[in-house]
Amino acid sequence: MILNLTDISDEPLQSQISRQVRAKILAGELGAGDNLPSIRGLARDQRVSVITVQRAYEYLEREGLIHSRRGKGFFVSELSDSAKKEMAKTRLLETLQAPLLAALAEGLSKADIQQIVQLLLAQSGDN
């Protein structure tokens, strides 16, 4: 599995791993039942500690995105479309919260922000 990790980011490596694996699952690049790389294997390939990968996998497991089978490794869990949609909504909310509060603090009105969101949606096409 190819991940793009960087140590110059403020984001911890375990968060980068979990975020990128989550994105691959939600985008369908990794499907239900797919076997994930072993913790040691991914740590070796990405040149990070085993603990870093273990923590990333534990986080993804708590989210319900992956599960472990004793002695066999980690696998992508079966997710309903509604579960995927709810996860995407949660991630969007988490991503937008800080910039939204900053925009309000800088004097933008709710109407200004709604106009910007509508513009972005219009630019994104029919999705």
Predicted regions and their residues:
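Short, solvent-exposed alpha-helical "recognition" segments
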Residues: 62-65, 123-127
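Short hydrophobic/aromatic-rich motifs at helix boundaries and adjacent loops
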Residues: 10-12, 28-29, 44, 68-73, ...
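N-terminal helix-turn-helix
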Residues: 36-67
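Short, cationic-aromatic polyanion-contact patches
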Residues: 14, 38, 72-88
